[in-house]
């Protein structure tokens, strides 16, 4: 059946195999008309040459991947160190996770190179690790070369050529891919250079192949493999027996043992691990292939050629992947139907059915059946190397496919793989070699081609991922490993054939002449022209098969190397640990030995010490016995001596007691004598002291008596003198009052008041004669009119007048004479002080009109500016209680206090005894008014404004002082402090008032002195001596409290000797309390 029939059958099944006809660049048919002379002989020679070159190429490509590991142990150790470093880097970077989500990672391949295109997958940070990119960085750089059968490029496999020369050769020979052909002369030179390079490097290629085979034997020998699973390194261990038997061969192994170790390693892997090793992704491989071209020539010609090659390769990859993917779909459908049928028959039959179905799946006809020309050029070495290459790149890509499409089939194949392990390993009939449906005659003659075809037929694509058929991975993967071994055996045969034909090549090359070369060129051109599209498609498939085989092999080798490195690392750690343990054991042994020696020495020392102690104890016992005997003898002697001593002491004590008794008696007698003498002396001193005291007492009494007498005399003289002074003052005051009363008498009669002055009194003032005689008469007349009871009453009760006198005094201020006073000085106020109201309510003699001492602040002068603050109808306007600067409070009205305290004779005392009314003006006032020039009220003096000031007269009472001019007085009298003998209650009130009103600040302690009774004849405040009292007659006339009380020497004076007591009418709190008889009652002061 030809290709057309195969396409028809594929279309009937539902497949549409792609054709490469439109994808490849057409080759010029310039040589089609030439004759095919000498075709067979040159062609046979050419086949032999190309076969040898391809064999050397495959061996060189795969050998370059393992040049780091030699046959000797030194090379193996070096490779082990590289593997350990790679393992540590991968463990520290667990980000390489497959894209299908099953957390299975892969073992990366970094170097896949070809002699024609230099495919080297190396570490490159420019490649992004996309979910579909499975190729990543690794420390292993394995170069797997892929020689595609393109005439004219076989001799580019020389390892001594530089990358630029290889690239130039590749670019010059792109005729097979559709580029324009060169002249025959250029082809001759090119082929000669290739043949020479191939012949010169045969020995080098052998050496590479020798190293590769040795390295494969070493690598395939050791026990375990590493696969990345769930983001961590998973160690797939073999059987314990295998590990125990082969652990001694880890550090050294032979070529014969490595194959067995590789086989055991592959069989020890699970199905999922084997599946992960045979997966590769198309895009990553193409990307690496393109990146490799960056290191070639960068000229425009080479760049165009390189782009053409890359595009052609991509077209070939795409077409082949599409065919394989369609074939994989057919396999999957058949496998699903067979698995359903097998499940009905039971577990045992299902296992056999799966095994028997494997050849059926592989026997499906494909359009990618390799042709004879393709099979002739495939070598065993290339397939072995491609095995390892494919293994690494297929891991994650298949996992993507399985996740989306064939997840169930993947799980079923894993579960069934272990069950069919033993059956397939012991039944070769279940693994018949796969033959193409229509093999050619060359394939029937050569079993190697059938093996390669079986491998190519086993490749499949799932979701753009190249992998191997499932039956090669099941049954412990024996099919796959057996196929790899068969390909390796074919490689060995090819090596023998190449060695056998090598002399012929050199001979044939020497015998050729130019004509033969030209004929050969013509034949080659004819062969190129005769290549059909099917051959080009088969060439592309062949390239993919070689690539997959080498990649799979490289994957397995690298996994095995990592497992060996892991084992070596573990073994090294174990040896180190064992060495440490041995060291510790040796040290412990030494320590134990030292301890034993020390114990023995201690025991010897203890024995010697015990012996010494025993001897010492015996010696001490003997000494103790001797000491006891000696002590006994000494004790007896001591007792004897003690008895004798006691006897002597007893005698001495007796004698001492007798002596003490005699001395005590003598001392007693002496003490008695001394006491008697002391008693006599004390009596004499006592009598003398008493006598002296009596004399001193008598003397003191005499002196006290004399002092008292002197004081009494002085007191009597003082009282007498004061009485005389007071009488004279009283006379003067009465005279002034009489003058004032005479002065205001006319106004008083006009207003209809009850005046007390008689016509005889008024007549006395009409004359302008001697004022003194008139005043004396008037004062004597006024004194006669005072009742005797009032004269004997206290001072506070003497100041009583008729209401007519009060009205007269009030009318005096309201008269036209003082109208100027009222208008000029609005500051004068006669309001009572609140303190006086408080004192007026006390339950003592203030009810009789007694006023406490003390001054009040003149701050009340600021109010009641009109008419001195008086109501014209007020009856007590000029009384002492209404004075703004007076210290007396308002008196109680007469209606409330009349007949309150009766006198001794039964007469009622007026209630307002202490409210002093203004008397009638004396003739002195008239004289002053009639004589303006001599009176202080002259016209010249009236020009200045009047001011009302509270001043004190000679008796210390307040009076009204109408100051007409500042020149009238040189200095105001200072306000003195109260006496120290004032009562506490009034003293506190007055002191608070003084502090508030500022009376303390008005006294200058340095310049002003308080006039007392002892140093001044006048009581009250001090005044300037230069001022004439006569100038103040009119002002003194306003002083109303002029009643005095006569004192008797027999009775203690009620008036205190302090200046305030005299000034305030003797009613001060410091006055001694006396009981004064007053009618039927007693007045207590």
Curated annotation (Swiss-Prot):
Q: Where is the composition biased (Polar residues)?
A: 979-992
Where does the protein principally reside?
Answer: cytoplasm
Name the residue ranges with Low complexity bias. Answer: 932-948
Localization per Swiss-Prot or TrEMBL: Cytoplasm
Coiled-coil annotated residue ranges, if any: 561-744
- One GO term of the biological process aspect: negative regulation of cytoplasmic translation
Using the UniProt annotation, give all residue ranges assigned to the region (Disordered).
Answer: 22-52, 176-200, 418-446, 492-526, 577-731, 877-900, 927-950, 971-996
Q: Which residues carry this modification: Phosphoserine?
A: 883
The organism's superkingdom is given as: Eukaryota
Compositional bias per record (Acidic residues), positions renumbered to this chain: 510-526
Q: Which InterPro entries match?
A: Fungal_stress_NST1, NST1
Its annotated function is as follows: May act as a negative regulator of salt tolerance.
Spell out the family assignment given in the record's similarity comment: Belongs to the NST1 family.
By what name is this protein known? Answer: Stress response protein nst1
Organism, scientific name: Schizosaccharomyces pombe (strain 972 / ATCC 24843) (Fission yeast)
This protein's gene is called: nst1
